């Protein structure tokens, strides 16, 4: 049996009845650290060149990141050269810390400090794996030996930093595989490292807690972080950071809960690039805060540009459903969704609190157009069809006509099996409702009122058909035309639905009329636009009757 759950065991959970983090709220953004140029880079099939790293670094600076991990200079000549270029060409703003990673070896730590000579602000990040799997199966050391590795590395970092006093140094330590480590042992190692670095004496220290591999639900990780927060020495003098991965799909949630549990800093990558299933996505985490009215401190307003550069350099395409950044995340195909969105957008005024249905943020905030929101396919309904006509062409239809047109468009979508553009919806609207049948163009009308009755003289025709004069009487212009049509075609013409609208000033016509006409058991709808409401109403009735006549003639011809 190859698919056998019995080969696994559940992760151990912490007995922590005094947990406080579930009642906490995130009220400000954590300190963000972008690790795209190191952790993200090492996961690429084709790692970045120095030129690509420079472009990526510049984008991170422009977005507002203040701590940027730039490489692993002791392990890569490209990373070493990149560090030197950043420093020697003065590419690092004064308020930005560059961060580098090194293993806990004396020669590699010395090489790392060589790469940082002349830096204004730098973070040296050391790590060693502390979980039972690594202690017992990979390195064959006991707990004491594991702790000794971390302490020696901390001493080497302190010694090398003292040789370069002009740099403002930050020291960072990660008990790698923290999420799979006994939490009390992780605290023991952290305290031993802090005893060397003495953050209480002014040294800036970051204690980074990695979910190197995500092994539990986010609440378990939050318990672990809160336990560290509550029990490490020098807590008020150190920055607790977290570094989550997405092996179980909860990297962002784990980081958010960790902040609730006391973390001050979060590491991640743009769009979540990283080993295996990726690092925590800084875009999602930042925009989650933004959607709650919290300034993330990072400018994601040019989302398409961010996505384009990340895709170009990493050669990884962004999923169309990726939160906040994917092509389809602000698109609605479902009819009920479209109807709700349309109504909410119609009510929204600049300056209002955003509460639109199905849109957690205003798409315009990240550079997206409202034109992308409602899109039409076979799942769309009247709301979506009405929305694209109103949005793109300024045409506002009555509900009964929305339903009718939606059925027509849905048939087209089912036949094609794909998306229907707004231009195609408009063409369908024109051909089925707005275009005037041959010979049924309103040429002129004359209305005379006498004894509460209107006598109408209406001429119809076009360049291809001779002009026909219609005469009728009624309570108003429309009823007079209906009377005239009944006399001409010998049927019982009834207007069963009618709506009229004024059009914007930027159109040739000033009025639009929508009608549904019934003759016997048949109905036909039509729309007309004209310079005044009377002309629009008369033309709409003429078009509807004309279409019925065309249909009857076609049926007779085909029988």
UniProtKB/Swiss-Prot annotation:
Single GO biological process annotation from the record: L-leucine biosynthetic process
Gene Ontology terms for molecular function: 2-isopropylmalate synthase activity; acetyl-CoA C-acetyltransferase activity; magnesium ion binding
Location of the region described as Regulatory domain in the Swiss-Prot/TrEMBL record: 436-559
Subcellular location: Cytoplasm
Gene3D superfamilies, A to Z: 3.30.160.270, Aldolase class I (3.20.20.70)
Known EC number: 2.3.3.13
Cofactor list: Mg(2+)
Domain Pyruvate carboxyltransferase: start-end pairs: 30-304
Role summary: Catalyzes the condensation of the acetyl group of acetyl-CoA with 3-methyl-2-oxobutanoate (2-ketoisovalerate) to form 3-carboxy-3-hydroxy-4-methylpentanoate (2-isopropylmalate).
Quaternary state and interactors: Homodimer.
UniProt record similarity statement: Belongs to the alpha-IPM synthase/homocitrate synthase family. LeuA type 2 subfamily.
Name recorded for this polypeptide: 2-isopropylmalate synthase
